[in-house]
Amino acid sequence: MNDTAPTQGVYLRFFVHENRRHGGMLLYDWLLAEAKKLGLSGGTAFRSIAGYGRHGVTHEAHFLELAGQETVRVDFVVTREAADKMLARVREENLPMFYAILPAEFGTLGGGK
């Protein structure tokens, strides 16, 4: 792999509850699968350790009674056009969820021998 010129794009983040489902799948898996279908080049799901949301409820992974209620963040570093396609897909399904879009510059570095 060789270096690529930096690309201007966005960091698209979705925040969902770990146990939330859509179409028979965990919602974070659904987001990753739909992004792949739309041609987004990659995505990653991260499980949170602790946090709180707009309702002020603290979620921590070590409380057994909150198992499955932790937040999963699903991230994509993509062009604005790709982010808009993904947001449109989520809107088509009428899925309520929080998201954030941040400006990003991205590319690839280096290569092997």
Model-flagged regions — what are they?
Residues 1-113:
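Positively charged, small/polar-rich N-terminal and surface patches that mediate targeting and assembly
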